[in-house]
From Swiss-Prot:
A molecular function GO annotation: RNA binding
Biased composition (Polar residues): 70-96
Residue numbers spanned by region Disordered: 63-102
InterPro entries in the cross-refs: Hfq, LSM_dom_sf, Sm
NCBIfam families: Hfq (TIGR02383), PRK00395.1 (NF001602)
Entry's family note: Belongs to the Hfq family.
Subunit structure: Homohexamer.
CDD domains: Hfq (cd01716)
Cellular component aspect of the GO annotation: cytosol
Domain of life: Bacteria
Species: Escherichia coli O17:K52:H18 (strain UMN026 / ExPEC)
Gene3D superfamilies: 2.30.30.100
Protein name, as recorded: RNA-binding protein Hfq
Sm domain residues: 9-68
């Protein structure tokens, strides 16, 4: 497995397996929403009212509607993760603002 996919595949697979609604932002700013039906090395099949094949090179960000556990028990790498959910980053920013005002 390529090093770049050691985080990508377990994350996308957890979103697919748990049928988590996602927002996918493309590099041109368009927001797509749906559930990940399938994916491979180059594309993600996103299902909403219709299925769309979205090329990964056009994707900027994948945002799950809720936190997911994406650690793979059979992966050869470490179980620690550098991935942070969007809400955590927002909370950290709000905490910093609060601390600065005190």
């Amino acid at each position: 497995m390529a090093k770049g996919q050691s985080l990508q595949d377990p994350f996308l697979n957890a979103l697919r397996r748990e049928r988590v609604p996602v927002s996918i932002y493309l590099v041109n700013g368009i927001k797509l929403q749906g559930q990940i039906e399938s994916f491979d090395q180059f594309v993600i099949l996103l299902k909403n009212t219709v299925s769309q094949m979205v090329y990964k090179h056009a994707i900027s960000t994948v945002v799950p509607s809720r936190p997911v556990s994406h650690h793979s028990n059979n992966a050869g790498g470490s179980t620690s993760s550098n991935y942070h959910h969007g809400s955590s980053a927002q909370n950290t920013s709000a905490q910093q603002d609060s601390e600065e005002n005190e």
